[in-house]
From Swiss-Prot:
InterPro entries: ATPase_NBD, Carb_kinase_FGGY, Carb_kinase_FGGY_CS, FGGY_C, FGGY_N, Glycerol_kin. Glycerol binds at residues 84-85, 136, 246-247. The keyword Phosphoprotein applies. Sn-glycerol 3-phosphate binds at residues 14, 84-85, 136, 246. This is Glycerol kinase. Signal peptide: none annotated.
């Protein structure tokens, strides 16, 4: 065993950190996971302690070594993937954050975002960054920290403070301050990065009064950014050579290397990303334009659609309504439903995401009769996830002017066979479920391994994460369109009800 080499992926998520060791076949050798504290200072605010995140990462690195018996000198390279947009500002000399990390979900900077919109910057920001102006992205979070921590603006202008998303923070810590870098995919989510010119945008920085000296250097997704300081990696000096935001890492882990390839991660929400190739395409229908990844001197762009409620709708059945004991049980109930699919659940618990962007909408149910059973209700909830995915896939095809032939899927709810079959039916295309559902961590490992020659090229990677199961559509066209028309009616009625509430 002592001669075998491995790749370690660090997957720093919203609620936990994980370290996974992969072998040459792309198989998981061991993993370790640690949750950390969610901080809610006020309603709608979400923060993390950046030092606690760093401690959790150190803990899972140790855990992965202990579980596997792999030694630090057997790790050929490290790949990092992370919760995107979450913002850290720290003191360059002490290495201490000057405020908590402001998390992507946090709405504390919404007034700043509204101010930018009212000043007429929507189109300018969209053309430069591919994003809509929103508190979701890092730009307003940096501005908020500089405004609310005494003396921060002045210190930033003197070059005493550094900004980074979580990838940047972890590389800076692992290298003991030797590398202050980010990658294309994370930079593209800051709302400060010009994704066409591939540079920090001076005009946006001026509008927000953010000193350029704070910003990390932007690098490709697969290159050596630095080496671990031996005292942070149990004596090992290992290259950190792959980085990507979590959804882009999943795109890469799903081997979606060709333009037109699309992946959907069924997590708490659902994130659908299409590789659009080397040409940047601005969405005309409220999807986000972003960078998928950049390797070998080329940058590949992507369109992204976000669904707020996917797997969490099944959690609601379990925890809120107590209709199921556990999430996998929903499949059994759905298969035992014998109604004619006339019940529609619109799970707009926190509004509707793409392509509607209706924050006032709330959850609703249509088509109930005296004969409606628990099984019917559970089935309708699962179907709502598939209908929302169709909303985005239809929009993507219009934006990209291309027909999507197959949808690559991963994430927890992708294990639900009923949902996957209904997804294939309502889209009318094949659903390819990855054999290895650890696609986010695998994507980071692939990027790291390519850079150091652990894997030779994309062709070698294509042999590693084959499709586990293919779901083919079996519903006839008229039935499919009749069901989808009912969904569109249900969404419209939900939005009308929200208007009446005003």
């Amino acid at each position: 065993m002592s001669q075998e080499k491995y790749i370690m992926a660090i997957d720093q998520g919203t609620t936990s950190s994980r370290a996974i060791i992969f072998n040459k076949k792309g198989e998981k050798v061991s993993s370790s996971q640690k949750e950390f504290t969610q901080i809610f200072p006020q309603a709608g605010w979400v923060e993390h302690n950046a030092n606690e995140i760093w401690n959790s990462v150190q803990s899972v690195i140790a855990g992965a070594f202990i579980e596997s018996g792999v030694k630090p000198n057997q790790i050929e390279a490290i790949g990092i993937t992370n919760q995107r947009e979450t913002t850290v500002v720290w003191d360059k000399n002490t290495g201490l954050p000057i405020y908590n990390a402001i998390v992507w979900q946090s709405r504390q900077t919404a007034p700043l975002a509204e101010q930018l919109k009212s000043q007429g910057y929507v189109e300018k920001f969209h053309e430069k960054t591919g994003l809509i102006i929103d508190a979701y992205f890092s730009a307003t979070k940096v501005r908020w920290i500089l405004d609310h921590v005494e003396g921060a603006q002045e210190r930033a202008e003197k070059g005493e403070l550094l900004f980074g998303t979580i990838d940047t923070w972890l590389v800076w810590k692992l290298t003991d301050g030797a590398a202050h870098v980010t990658d294309y995919s994370n930079a593209a989510r800051t709302m400060l990065y010009n994704i066409k010119e591939l540079k920090w945008d001076d005009e946006i920085l001026e509008i927000l009064n953010i000193p350029k000296a704070m910003l990390p250097e932007v690098r490709s997704n697969s290159e050596i950014y630095g080496k671990t300081a031996p005292f942070h990696f149990y004596g090992g000096e290992v290259p950190i050579s792959g980085m990507a935001g979590d959804q882009q890492a999943a795109l890469f882990g799903q081997l979606a290397f060709e333009p037109g390839m699309v992946k959907n991660t069924y997590g708490t929400g659902s994130f659908i990303i299409m590789n659009t190739g080397e040409e940047m395409q601005l969405s005309e229908n409220n999807l986000l334009t972003t960078i998928g990844y950049g390797i070998n001197g080329k940058v590949y762009y992507a369109l992204e659609g976000s669904i707020f409620i996917a797997g969490s709708a099944i959690q609601w059945l379990r925890d809120g309504l107590r209709m199921v004991e556990n999430s996998p049980e929903s499949e059994k109930y759905a298969l035992n439903s014998h109604n004619n699919d006339e019940v529609y659940v619109v799970p707009a618990f926190t509004g509707l995401g793409a392509p509607y962007w209706d924050q006032n909408a709330r959850g609703s149910v249509f088509g109930l009769t005296r004969g409606t059973s628990k099984e019917d209700f559970i089935k309708a909830t699962l179907q709502s996830i598939a209908y929302q995915v169709r909303d985005i896939i239809d929009t993507m095809q219009v934006d990209a002017k291309t027909a999507i032939q197959v949808l690559k899927v991963d994430g927890g709810a992708a294990m639900n066979n009923f949902l996957m079959q209904f997804q294939a039916d309502i889209l009318g295309i094949d659903i390819a479920r990855a054999k290895n559902l650890e696609t986010t961590a695998l994507g980071a490992a692939f990027l790291a391994g390519l850079s150091v020659g652990y894997w030779k090229d994309l062709d070698e990677l294509r042999t590693l994460n084959e499709t586990g199961e293919l779901f083919e559509p079996s519903m006839n066209e008229s039935r499919k369109e009749q069901l989808y028309k009912g969904w569109k009616k249900a969404v419209k009625a939900t939005q009308v009800f929200a208007e009446i509430d005003d």
